Amino acid sequence: MVTAASGRCGFTPQRREPRGSPCRCPRLPARRRRPGTDTAAAAVAESPQELQAFRDYGESWYRSRKGLESRFQPREPLARQPQVTAEARCKLVSWLIPVHRHFGLSFEALCLTVNTLDRFLATTPVAADCFQLLGVTALLIASKQVEVHPPSLKELLALCCGAFTVQQLRNLECIVLLRLGFDLSAPTISFFLEHFSQVRLQAEGADAAEAADARILAGGISELSLADYAFIGYAPSLLAAGSLGLADRLLGHRRPLDLRVSGYPEELLRDCMEQLQLLVSLNGQSLPLLLPPEVVQKCPWLRGGR
């Protein structure tokens, strides 16, 4: 079992204060901003070169990533965890969501973080006192994959109330990489959201504004699903298609995405959308915090949550 106190993550930390859940960590300082990511229009804004690249390679890249889903999807990651529960996982991922936003990281980085976390949990028992450290370690590994400027070790550890050392973080990073065989490039919900949104824009008479709003709302719904263990068995491509379908429905779009592009049977898509609808209804106060104001204004049923 990987623990902090036993030194398997490094040296025993010098505890300056009692270590609690992630929610007890200090308030996040001012958020870094990624240029062009805070508006709905930015969700689908692409250069002519990028659009042409999608036309040339988008479908083959999609088939390649979809073919890898089963290989990277963890199976019951908590089955071997005597100390980590679904509730603890929910709290950790719910904490990582604002942390990744604070650092200005992409949704792709968050998806890879949760995938790395779950795949490691499926292979290795983790002690409760090491779980938060595992979360920031997974975030660090994911950020190194897809971000130009990943957060520093010092920045990440500062969010853990000084409970862990740099050496512990480095040691756990090595353990995670070894257990996963350095096999990290998992297909993500983020990738499939972008792909289906681009497919939508290629259709005749596509409404770019509707596509942008649906993409952003679907992204918020997908973030909520990452924290809910009930969605662990859903493939990323299915969650992406279901989130976009639900977003179109909630926004009352006249030209919704044709969900047949996902290749999933109608009944499977319907089940996924129903589960996501329940998730949204249970998180009416949280979802607006994940969305820009201009999208919230188009969702009357969400305005009370702001």
Where do the PLM segments sit?
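Acidic, serine/threonine-rich low-complexity regulatory regions at protein termini
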Residues: 1-306
